[in-house]
């Protein structure tokens, strides 16, 4: 059984990685 904290932890982790990749792609396009 997955706890709520674990669920939000994984969700926050995926969201953070997505944001980092999005920012990285934007920086590459700006150059």
Curated annotation (Swiss-Prot):
Main location: plastid
GO terms (BP aspect): photosynthesis
UniProt xrefs under InterPro entries: Cyt_b6/f_cplx_su6 (IPR007802)
GO CC annotation terms, alphabetical: chloroplast thylakoid membrane; cytochrome b6f complex
Keyword Chloroplast among UniProt keywords: yes
Recorded superkingdom: Eukaryota
Transmembrane segments: 4-24
Topological relation to the membrane, as annotated: Single-pass membrane protein
Keyword annotations: Chloroplast, Electron transport, Membrane, Photosynthesis, Plastid, Thylakoid, Transmembrane, Transmembrane helix, Transport
Disulfide bonds: none
Location within or outside the cell: Plastid, Chloroplast thylakoid membrane
Any GO MF annotation of the entry: electron transporter, transferring electrons within cytochrome b6/f complex of photosystem II activity
UniProt KW Transit peptide keyword: no
Family: Belongs to the PetL family.
Subunit structure: The 4 large subunits of the cytochrome b6-f complex are cytochrome b6, subunit IV (17 kDa polypeptide, PetD), cytochrome f and the Rieske protein, while the 4 small subunits are PetG, PetL, PetM and PetN. The complex functions as a dimer.
Described purpose of this protein according to its UniProt entry: Component of the cytochrome b6-f complex, which mediates electron transfer between photosystem II (PSII) and photosystem I (PSI), cyclic electron flow around PSI, and state transitions. PetL is important for photoautotrophic growth as well as for electron transfer efficiency and stability of the cytochrome b6-f complex.
Protein name, per record: Cytochrome b6-f complex subunit 6
Organism of origin: Chaetosphaeridium globosum (Charophycean green alga)
């Amino acid at each position: 059984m997955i706890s709520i904290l674990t669920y939000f932890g994984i969700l926050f982790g995926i969201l953070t990685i997505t944001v980092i990749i999005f920012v990285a792609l934007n920086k590459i396009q700006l150059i």
